[in-house]
Amino acid sequence: MGKLTVVGILTLFIFYIVAASGKCTAPVNCPAGWKKYKTNCYFFSPDGKNWHDAAKQCQTMGGYLVKITDSEENSWVVDMITKSVKHKYGYWMGMADLKNEGDWRWVNDSSAVSYSNWHRGQPNNANNEDCGHFWSAVNYEWNDIVCNTDQMGYIC
């Protein structure tokens, strides 16, 4: 086998590995009314709902309640919240401990919450609080609250 053939095969192999790893992705175009951050699109609701209805609305729009993976993303979301419609209690996020108390999971993929930004003393499960939200009273740090709290904003 000639050097040119070996180089060609190696080039194709490397291209395949890079493509398979997902590092070569097309640019993300978000629907009208959605905001782009890195490779994701986010929707900040102008209306309020309880957690279950908010989750259904996100699914209807082709998404899910927001999953926060790191402090940088959290900071960006909080910045966007401060520029959005204000809701009395804050905004729903896509985590809950509905199945096992204290076992906070992201509802889109059931993964455990690893990064968090809980307000001091939270989550405390007062009154059976099983759903997570960005709490407006404490600069949008995280809090657990009763899932049927109405008029909470939501982020998909």
Swiss-Prot record:
Matching PANTHER family: MANNOSE, PHOSPHOLIPASE, LECTIN RECEPTOR RELATED
Compartmental location: Secreted
Q: Could you name the Gene Ontology cellular component terms for this entry?
A: extracellular region
Q: Name one Pfam family in it.
A: Lectin_C
Tell me the GO molecular function terms. carbohydrate binding
Q: What is its main location?
A: secreted
Q: Does the keyword Isomerase apply?
A: no
Which parts of the sequence belong to the C-type lectin domain? 37-156
Its recorded name reads: Perlucin-like protein
Q: Which CDD domains match?
A: CLECT_DC-SIGN_like
**PROSITE patterns the record matches:** C_TYPE_LECTIN_1, C_TYPE_LECTIN_2
Q: Which InterPro entries match?
A: C-type_lectin-like (IPR001304), C-type_lectin-like/link_sf (IPR016186), C-type_lectin/snaclec_domain (IPR050111), C-type_lectin_CS (IPR018378), CD209-like_CTLD (IPR033989), CTDL_fold (IPR016187)
Which N-terminal stretch is annotated as signal sequence? 1-22
Q: In which tissues is it expressed?
A: Component of the organic matrix of calcified shell layers like nacre and prisms.
Kindly list the cysteine pairs connected by disulfide bridges. 30-41, 58-156, 131-147
| Keywords annotated in UniProt | Disulfide bond, Lectin, Secreted, Signal
